[in-house]
Amino acid sequence: MENAAPRDGMFIHLSNGPEDPHRVLMALKMAEVMSADKDVLMYLDIEAVRLVVKDAPDVSKEGFPSSLEQIKKLLEAGVIIQACPTCLKVAGYSESDLMDGVVLANKEKFFTFTQGKTLSIDY
């Protein structure tokens, strides 16, 4: 029996926050689509960290599920969502303010979340 090829990965970088719903929701939708058969890691920095704190606004735009709905679905699907610790601090938050399932960014995880090739997309 042959070993299965390692799954490829998708690294999605999101720096825009609630003020840009189209970019936010497109990044989350792309993570959902790719997670069907790829390993996915989302890295949120700059303004995007405000999307994954416990009191995050529920960003919406016609044609997309809301941000809170998508984030919940992604976490349930095993997508890794990491928040930049420095950006979190600058925004006035700490690790304890993150939604359950969202973690502080870990540079080692950037290189180990998948065993296959990695494609990166930036929003």
Tell me the role of every PLM-derived stretch.
Residues 5-6, 11-25, 52-56:
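Short, glycine-rich nucleotide/cofactor-binding loops
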Residues 7-9, 37-40, 80, 116-118:
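Loop/turn elements at helix/coil->beta-strand transitions in domains of secreted/extracellular proteins
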Residues 17-19, 47-50, 87-91, 111:
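Solvent-exposed loop/turn segments at secondary-structure junctions
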Residues 23-38:
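Histidine-anchored nucleotide/phosphate-binding helix
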Residues 31, 40-46, 82-85:
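Short internal beta-strands
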Residues 58-87:
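A glycine-rich helix N-cap at a beta->alpha junction
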Residues 77, 82, 95-99, 103-112, ...:
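A short aromatic-anchored loop/beta-hairpin motif
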Residues 122-123:
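Aromatic- and Gly/Pro-rich donor/ligand-binding loops
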